[in-house]
Amino acid sequence: MSDILDKIIAVKREEIAAALKSAPLEELKLQASARDSRDFVGALRGKHAAGHAAVIAEVKKASPSKGVLRERFVPADIARSYAEHGAACLSVLTDEQFFQGSARYLEEARAACNLPVLRKDFIVDPYQVLEARAMGADAILLIAAALDTPLMVDLEAYAHSLGLAVLVEVHNRDELSAALELKTPLVGINNRNLRTFETTIDTTLGMLDAIPDDRIVVTESGILSRADVERMEAAGVHTFLVGEAFMRAENPGAELARMFF
């Protein structure tokens, strides 16, 4: 398979250039300043303190590798279902071209519940960080495979200055070394290789020994069953970002409860 990540990043740069014309920085800053903030990291730690898994439940219509995951896609209903069944936070895809996401989906999901929300997108520029705050996000994703370390550090600092939490995502030990330069406690291990889209949960299990105890490990992608959850919890991983398994279920929140609680 060709390198999907490079294609996505190229599209992101085109989108940013167009967005700067339609929504200038000063306009975005006004929108961002009007947004309230929810404690993303605190919500995860609250679940841990209560002895529960902390689930970041994803609102995702489609993916490049799997196509459309959910035909009847109503973000507000999905968000409410997750909140009612024990999710700690939400993750909402805002990438339009590859994941059929939307900023509007994030706004609708956040308005439907009280959970903190992660903007799930491919962030490569400070403009997108401000854009995330303006659309109501409480956290952003920084993907180590898409960013060099100095830029990742700068994007994190800007995010924190806006009151946004940061989840830094890695897939291998080289990316992990770069990610540990950041201040965020949230280290996501993506079990899916973003350059090939191949997935194995052994990716998370094979990297745990290199992560300091003061970081919160978030296992991402490929968590599809109760057995996968139990395997992670046995290894000391208690924070999960899950989308596909929930999106394919008739009732996403009920599937969350079945897998985790």
Swiss-Prot record:
Its EC number is 4.1.1.48. Gene3D superfamilies: Aldolase class I. One of its GO terms (biological process) is L-tryptophan biosynthetic process. Pathway: Amino-acid biosynthesis; L-tryptophan biosynthesis; L-tryptophan from chorismate: step 4/5. One of its GO terms (molecular function) is indole-3-glycerol-phosphate synthase activity. It catalyses: 1-(2-carboxyphenylamino)-1-deoxy-D-ribulose 5-phosphate + H(+) = (1S,2R)-1-C-(indol-3-yl)glycerol 3-phosphate + CO2 + H2O. The keyword Amino-acid biosynthesis applies. SUPFAM superfamilies: Ribulose-phoshate binding barrel. Keywords: Amino-acid biosynthesis, Aromatic amino acid biosynthesis, Decarboxylase, Lyase, Tryptophan biosynthesis. PROSITE patterns: IGPS. InterPro entries: Aldolase_TIM, Indole-3-glycerol_P_synth, Indole-3-glycerol_P_synth_dom, Indole-3-GlycerolPSynthase_CS, RibuloseP-bd_barrel. It comes from the Bacteria. Belongs to the TrpC family. HAMAP family: IGPS_B. This is Indole-3-glycerol phosphate synthase. It comes from Burkholderia thailandensis (strain ATCC 700388 / DSM 13276 / CCUG 48851 / CIP 106301 / E264).
